[in-house]
């Protein structure tokens, strides 16, 4: 007999993935160069040469039996030590090897962090708009996701509503900065006030409220902006990171959870997540990727391409009369649709072979997301299609 719970999930397929697959089918019909696919956040720049060199060194200079052997459940020691040292250099916090747990990307990091700090029946708060997989990640723990309504058009967290919704049942808050889908970077003032609220409520309820911070876009910031590090503002923070974007390694699926020094349970959380990983059949990410990435932590891919693409699209959208905020980072724009129904707007956009994602997917209505992690020349070639789309609403 099939598991009806998981069978029921088939009715909730990813709009992003479906749009991406439509783009592939359409490209087969009219040519790849004629389809302007802004659906999927798949990096479009190559990984750093240092990563390639590190892989070559490992494959040619290391003992193959040791290289391809199992690593400890808590992860490769070289990787964990290197990540801790990198975080200390970057953010001035005293992380140690024991605070780092490697995972299969940020998705694995979030899933393990949530399982470690929630119990069935607990509540987890997040801010709209939010990455749609947060729902299954939270529900998979037996907890319940509650969504703080958005604060448009700037989309900084709605802290007034958040404070009202932060009841005694909430054991964890899940944030994402720089944010997918808006590109918003949470300001230092926002994080300071968020930390104050969490501290006040933790004291009032007699238990610490954990902060799980989803940060795969940390290294993609614009206009020389520094991205504030949430763990620097609140001690009970589990930081979830991925190398998919910063090193352009999405297919390698490597990320980590960093347990902030001084966090409640710091001495056991990594061991807990290692056990969770074993018992749910995930285990560690490939050890060779951990070791290669450990030698590349101070470099990134050429991320400047995304700022170039953002400027091209942002300026064109503004010139065409779209309501859109300038993003602080990521590779997403989040303009207001030219009609109330974002799904209908995206269907109209397909008439011009523009593939956009409706904001309903992210928990808000009336907006669309453009993932501009595509070739810059293709961005330029898409601008006339945007003009035609805007003209269709005049």
Give short role names for the model-derived ranges.
Residues 1-16, 27-59, 74, 78, ...:
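PLP-dependent class I/II
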Residues 61-63:
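N-terminal alpha-helical segment of soluble enzymes
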Residues 66-67:
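Pre-Walker A segment
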